[in-house]
């Protein structure tokens, strides 16, 4: 069975507000409660929530340095300077480069893009990239999804006669790089109203500002939004505020008139066209785009996303898909090796963390493997492999509530470099320092982690009876999308549930359950459910015993036909209490 989870029911929303909103909107009180949980308390707020409007996007010139950035881009275009669009090799970086490059290529042919090689140059702005720009006569570099800590690189570029505009969304340090403009909504001196844009989102605000300044119709930017929603979903930024608007219209573009490269990814992923969701991007499209940078080169991803014809897009997409299949094969093998190491006591850490090292593991998948180990053991996790020049590189993933970045930062004197955020980080150190690092970070984690952080939690939004899941309920619930951080798919709890006798094990190894569930109080209302990695409950369920289930409600499409299904988050035998 999977790691046992703790179920926590959210506090009930204010009953009077729920009742009023339910009456005003004519909706089930459970749906009204979900709205109040999301900060929606009035009819007007509900209308804005259910009907996102591009007119409500913030003025891009509210972002610090935006006027300087727009002016410098314009001077480069009218002065016939060469512009280099430079971005990270992950999905956020490659979509950002594709978006800004696609926009500027309409205005100048003196433009190119650059994605650093993951294993040669590493993350962010590189000296090699700047040298390449200088050798090829570029006068302006626009960085995307990177650069906020590239102080020395900016100075280096300036010494070679190259100006830089930084578009980033990561937390800056005390000293901001001395670039022509630094666009980052997380700058302390930036008054922009929404600070959780993706890197691609910051790039979009730049092209929005340029268009606004020089009379380019906003409508011409809408085709770029399919790139932006892929970035928002894949980088796991909040799907609230401005991101909710951008994601909503990005999905409309992706499901209506996607660019050739994304259409190829949809086809190669086996997804149903016109019904793509945030989850589809997170689990199907994003990993494929990421595979280019993990296994080959991020440049291939930009070539895919900027392809102008279907044949080219499908050719590149097919190659990227093959890289993704290779990535999955390597991922499975290394995950099993890492699990075996932990289970046989070959960890480099004690009981409060999971740290493993194998010099032969592929650097492109250690982050994925770290996530798998968190799922298995629910401890802060770092997976290391050998890099080059006597260095080891690691990818870190944390559990809810524990700041692993802070733990890594406490060992910074042992590191060559590191970066990331609360729950995910990357780091590099000399192999000779690995033992000392493991000992120190284990001590740091042991002193700060509490038992509550070591048990995964299922947050239950509301109790629900199956009889409430009507076509109207589903239609309104669908309007809560797009789901994501800050607006997660609601999780419901239904008690005293049985399988109708048709339940079975599914999956290559029979590890999952496909069930037809009924509730004792409503025996004629049955609903399909899928429970991943829960085959351990099969004997209990097959014997006709009751369970309680936590789940979200999803729509699955097959050949254009929608089917409602419960996606089970966790289940308990009926004698256990919440």
Sequence positions of predicted segments:
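Cofactor-/ligand-binding subdomain signature composed of acidic, glycine-rich
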Residues: 1-79, 230, 284-322
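Flexible, glycine/threonine-enriched loop-and-boundary segments that flank and lead into catalytic domains
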Residues: 344-371
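Gly-rich Lys/Arg/Thr-decorated short loops/hinges at beta-loop-alpha junctions or inter-strand turns
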Residues: 46-57, 81, 106-115, 185-187, ...
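Functional cores that coordinate and move charged inorganic groups
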Residues: 135-140, 146, 151-294, 298-304, ...
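Short glycine-cluster motifs
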Residues: 382-398
